[in-house]
Swiss-Prot record:
Molecular function in Gene Ontology: DNA binding; DNA-binding transcription factor activity
Region (Disordered): 1-46
Recorded family membership: Belongs to the AP2/ERF transcription factor family. ERF subfamily.
Alphabetically ordered keywords of this record: Activator, DNA-binding, Nucleus, Stress response, Transcription, Transcription regulation
The keyword Signal is assigned to this record: no
Species of origin: Oryza sativa subsp. indica (Rice)
InterPro entries xrefs: AP2/ERF_dom, AP2/ERF_dom_sf, DNA-bd_dom_sf, DRE1A-I
Protein's recorded name: Dehydration-responsive element-binding protein 1G
GO CC annotations, alphabetized: nucleus
Amino acid sequence: MDVSAALSSDYSSGTPSPVAADADDGSSAYMTVSSAPPKRRAGRTKFKETRHPVFKGVRRRNPGRWVCEVREPHGKQRIWLGTFETAEMAARAHDVAALALRGRAACLNFADSPRRLRVPPIGASHDDIRRAAAEAAEAFRPPPDESNAATEVAAAASGATNSNAEQFASHPYYEVMDDGLDLGMQGYLDMAQGMLIDPPPMACDPAVGGGEDDNDGEVQLWSY
């Protein structure tokens, strides 16, 4: 039976790879960046350093993005793994690719990567490695910030309140109120306006016979 075919079938069926299975029983330990830090080239330092100070195979890409690529064990070709939101996501993607390419000779960013990540078998294609790296990075995506979530909820509530206010303002009832309170009360409005009119001047009743200065008689105040 072909060993490569068996490993490929195990990977496609979702069973743990031999690399991860051996790591579970603790038979051997992997090298990590803490035990074997990567070497830095001697000479003049670049003006703008983009490599992560701790994680291996991780570089910064503005603004606030992290990229990851790995080199093949016996060649100069590099495998691009993608761009990620956090450095830890890129570091996890690196560990998956390093395990798939180098096996136990891989230098990892996290000692628990063989146990926690689904690693493709050694000799897997570049596409399979990229797919596994993307899955590993997505598994370690940080949760959304609670404060941002609360801000979004408040903004949504404010928008709903403004929308309701606009709907109420456009209701026919409010349009009638704005047009002058014309709700069958025009007669009351006319009476109120009539009470504001000055009364007619006072005049003497000719039947009494009084003059201009005689105010003892009855005076007709209103004339209809």
